[in-house]
Amino acid sequence: MTIRYTGNAAYGYANSLYMALRESGAPPTELPEPGFLECLTTMPFGTDYLRVGRDLLVYFSSPLANPDQGLSTALDALGWECREERDGTPEAALARLGEAAARGPVLAGPLDMGALGYMPQHAQLSGSDHFVVVLGVEGERVRVHDPDGYPCVAMPAVEFLRAWRAERVRYAPTPYAMRSGFRQTRRPTREAMIARTLGAARAGLAADPGGPDRYGGPRAFRLLAADLRGAMAKRLVGHLTSFALPLAARRSHDAAAFLREAGHAEAAGLFERKAQCFGEAQYWAVQERWTDTADLMEALADLEGALIHALEPADASGG
């Protein structure tokens, strides 16, 4: 039985986008749920394994995009535009943030979670990216809705600026990125949104940067399995169990629903099996049963290969 999941997930940018569009006048009956928005970013489609010396980091997400780019991709598919601003001095950034928040919702990010002092474990999260909706600048404070479970939270502006600078976020090209002034310019159907996304989804699944420090596709899963069977497993445990595996399970579950709606029943079934494998791996990784965890990564490599084949256009597969 398949029951759609509702609950917590590390969907910082998808949940923030949902809040921003809802408060910008998106009709509630037309605004897709965060899981659908996540798929429009193309992030659930692919794997990105970074192996730099003894430093290992895996993201079960497209190696062709990052969350900042994904937001722009999703907005385009949705038929919405916004004002996008970034860079500048801290003083100028804070001033424009306050002015924009006085007019409507502001989606700010990426932020460095390591500088978000209202998070109990922020000291262990340096370099992890995040997105929030800014409610306003109140003198020396910034107030936000943080979709990780912190509504209406306020923090010193100087600390917010430190997080917003995002110096340790690996993909942040410039500091102080924000989106505001959201407006709808087209009203595409859900079918059109999905069709606009499928090409990038296929490309993300098949993408493999090829090393020597970064890998994707089925090879990324097989390399991860080999590392989990060796001495490197303990370097990955915290990242896997607290973030990467539960997020991958949720993304795969939502991607299954997305592809089912698109009429790709075979691919949807494969993504649902991926979600189950990630969910099983969560238990084994917490228990530090690395052989069992590695076996599931091998199974996921096979599923990824099957997905690439299942989503090939008919002319490419000889159909």
Give the location of each predicted region.
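Alpha-helix capping and helix-coil boundary motifs
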Residues: 85-93, 185-193, 232, 289-292
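Charged, long alpha-helical assembly modules
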Residues: 243-319
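A diffuse structural propensity rather than consistent per-protein peaks
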Residues: 33, 156, 189-190, 286-294
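Short secondary-structure junctions and interdomain/linker hinges
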Residues: 23, 27, 78, 104-108, ...
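Conserved active-site-adjacent core of cysteine acyl-enzyme catalytic domains
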Residues: 1-34, 38-186
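Exposed alpha-helical structural elements
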Residues: 16, 35, 70-73, 92, ...
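Amphipathic, soluble alpha/beta structural segments
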Residues: 111-116, 120, 162, 183-187, ...
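Noncatalytic regulatory segments and standalone regulatory/sensor domains
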Residues: 139-246, 255-258
